[in-house]
């Protein structure tokens, strides 16, 4: 059992925010270089992450959202996936957080739930991403912003196939509590996934009252 699991249902854990805004303010082209800055400017990434710890985050989320090979392929860097992943983990670990979480974002590939080949490809992408990040010093994986329930299921299956670390699964939802672009309530999405992930969450731009309603409904799923 990872140490972070001992805190589930006992402590309120705060995850660090994405550092893309800070890096952009410092002149980094986050649309093109967000993953590569781990290799090129580790000190810049380290300083941005340390700011999150100073703000009180117990869980530091590594700068690895775009680590899937299909995403790196757009920049012709898929063959450096492991190098980029390990650089990001190293920089985050050097900040000495209470807990280190590695984020994996969507593959960006088309996914046909009715096609075994399509599903297998997606699962393989997520498995390779988790394998590149490794388990050493990593307390959990954050699967963030996947494109609907099927994509999230593929991500969970892929990570589970190579790691026993806890999984945090987070959806993007609208003001009505629906998974963006998929016409399904967050609570229903979680119910479909059942016990696939250890922790479920969501990102929303909704007002606090609506967000609280979504949270309560999801907690009952």
Residue ranges and their predicted role:
Residues 1-221:
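Domain-level signal for soluble alpha/beta catalytic cores
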């Amino acid at each position: 059992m990872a140490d972070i699991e001992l805190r589930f249902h006992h402590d309120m854990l705060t995850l660090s925010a994405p550092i893309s805004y800070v890096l952009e303010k410092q002149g980094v082209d986050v649309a093109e270089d967000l993953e590569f800055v781990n290799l090129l400017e580790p000190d810049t990434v380290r300083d941005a992450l340390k700011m999150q710890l100073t703000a009180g985050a117990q869980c530091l989320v590594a700068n690895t959202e775009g680590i899937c090979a299909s995403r790196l392929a757009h920049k012709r860097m898929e063959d450096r996936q492991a190098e980029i992943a390990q650089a990001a983990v190293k920089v985050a670990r050097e900040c000495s957080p209470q807990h280190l979480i590695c984020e994996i974002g969507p593959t960006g590939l088309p996914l046909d739930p009715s096609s075994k080949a399509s599903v297998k490809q997606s699962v393989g992408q997520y498995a390779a991403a988790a394998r590149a990040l490794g388990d050493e010093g990593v307390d959990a994986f954050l699967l963030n912003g996947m494109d609907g329930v099927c994509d999230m299921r593929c991500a969970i299956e892929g990570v589970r196939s190579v790691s026993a670390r806890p999984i945090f699964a987070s959806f993007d939802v609208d003001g009505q509590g629906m998974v963006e672009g998929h016409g399904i309530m967050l609570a229903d999405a979680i119910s479909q996934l059942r016990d696939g992930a250890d922790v479920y969450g969501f990102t929303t731009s909704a007002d606090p009252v609506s967000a609280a309603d979504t949270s309560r409904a999801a907690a009952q799923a």
